[in-house]
C-alpha cells in the first residue's frame, strides 16, 4: 500500500508532482521488489492508499485516473469506505469519517473505473449498489 510519510505526519500538507504518476511509479517499483523476492506476480494486488498521505483532491484524482494504475497489470484494492475525504467533500471540513451513502458512491465509481477489490465497512449496502451497477453495465 502506498502511504506518504508516517501515520503521525502523513496528512500534513502532502505534496506530489503528479499524484497518480508518482503513486504508479511507487507501486511499480514495489511490485518489482516483491517479484524479485520470489512472490508470484499473480498473487499480488496493489493499493494506492486512499486517505493515507493524500489530500481530498488527491484521493479523487486517483479514482478519476484509475486506468493509469490498472496499466500496472495487477488488481487494485480501493478502500474509500468511511474516509474523511468523503465527509469533507460533502461540506464538513472537520469530518473524521464519511457517510455510508458517500462510501457506496465512491465504491461504485471505483468499480466502474476497473477496481476489482473494494475494502468496505457496510457490506450489504455495497453489495446491493454494486449489483445494480453491474446489471446496468451489462
How would you describe each model-predicted region?
Residues 1-37, 52-138:
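Active-site-adjacent loop and "lid" segments of alpha/beta metabolic enzymes
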Amino acid at each position: 500500500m502506498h502511504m506518504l510519510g508516517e501515520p503521525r505526519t502523513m496528512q500534513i500538507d502532502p505534496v506530489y508532482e503528479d499524484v497518480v504518476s508518482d503513486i504508479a511509479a511507487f507501486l511499480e517499483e514495489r511490485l518489482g521488489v516483491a517479484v524479485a523476492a520470489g512472490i508470484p506476480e499473480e498473487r499480488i494486488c496493489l493499493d494506492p492508499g486512499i486517505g493515507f498521505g493524500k489530500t481530498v483532491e488527491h484521493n479523487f484524482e486517483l479514482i478519476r485516473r484509475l486506468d493509469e494504475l490498472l496499466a500496472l497489470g495487477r488488481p487494485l484494492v480501493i478502500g474509500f469506505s468511511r474516509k474523511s475525504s468523503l465527509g469533507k467533500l460533502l461540506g464538513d471540513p472537520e469530518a473524521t469519517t464519511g457517510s455510508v451513502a458517500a462510501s457506496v458512491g465512491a465504491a461504485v465509481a471505483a468499480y466502474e473505473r476497473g477496481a476489482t477489490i473494494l475494502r468496505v465497512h457496510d457490506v450489504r449496502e455495497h453489495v446491493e449498489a454494486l449489483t445494480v451497477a453491474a446489471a446496468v453495465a451489462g
